[in-house]
Amino acid sequence: MEEKIFDENHKIKINYKKTCSCPSNHISCIDAKSWLKSQVAIQEFYYEKRDIRDKNIHPATFPIGLPKFFINLLTHEGELVLDPFGGVGTTLIAARDLKRNAVTFDLKKEYVDYANNRLRSLLPDENTTQIEINDNALNIGNYLYDDSVKLIITSPPYANLLNHKRKNKSKRGDLRKDQYYDKIQQYSDNKEDLGTLEVDDFIEKLGEIYEKLYPLLVEKGHSIIDITDLWDNKVKYGRRLPLHLKTINKMESIGYELRNIIIWDRRNLVNNVGIFGWPNNYITLGTTFEYLLDFWKPLKA
């Protein structure tokens, strides 16, 4: 990595102060009309041409519109956005569009290279910086100053959800046997990858990461976690594993305060769904929604 991106303290040289002329007591640059729309607790997001949908490149990406929504709502131009599980650069693209600085991290070098190459293909913005770093999220504190991050936003690996052969049970009939059928699409086989862990181990490791991120976040800075519940098929009739509740409990034990829960309505992204559980085991389609958990770092007492 080029030395010029680091300062004399070996931290990333990146601005984190707002560059807009908005009043300092405003949370962001958003106007009242947009604020009103953002108060709706159920939100839809749509994929665009720039989004990565090929699961051979990355098994699970959220739309650029999702981080864009929160970056626009919770930060000013020039402020710093952090994604500890950056994947192929979705959050970086959103930050570039909105004139925010952003740093993301990922364990997998292929994802990091892909993300940074995506940025190079865009028109440069001389006033902001966006970069993805190849390192463990546990080490993020080595790269950034305390009280420098205005927003943390991410979609972490959902424990070992992808670490099994894909059966596409939520798809209809013959549509189940698509190009991804019977394939394992996990993020990596790195033992440090949260996507290889059982649920309780996943929650503990996620908490360890967010405890280290806590000093980096400014007071009243927000942290958004996109999470879904899991379904355990190892027992008769299956059982729901409430990952969102476990995440809330862990985050609050660290010191984060839950502010909002937004439902990501994914029905516009789910097509040709199949039937399962009928006629004696009612199970909701987990693919139709996810939880967007909004925490902040409260003011010191």
Regions found by a protein language model. Give the residues of each.
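Class I S-adenosyl-L-methionine-dependent methyltransferase catalytic core
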Residues: 1-301
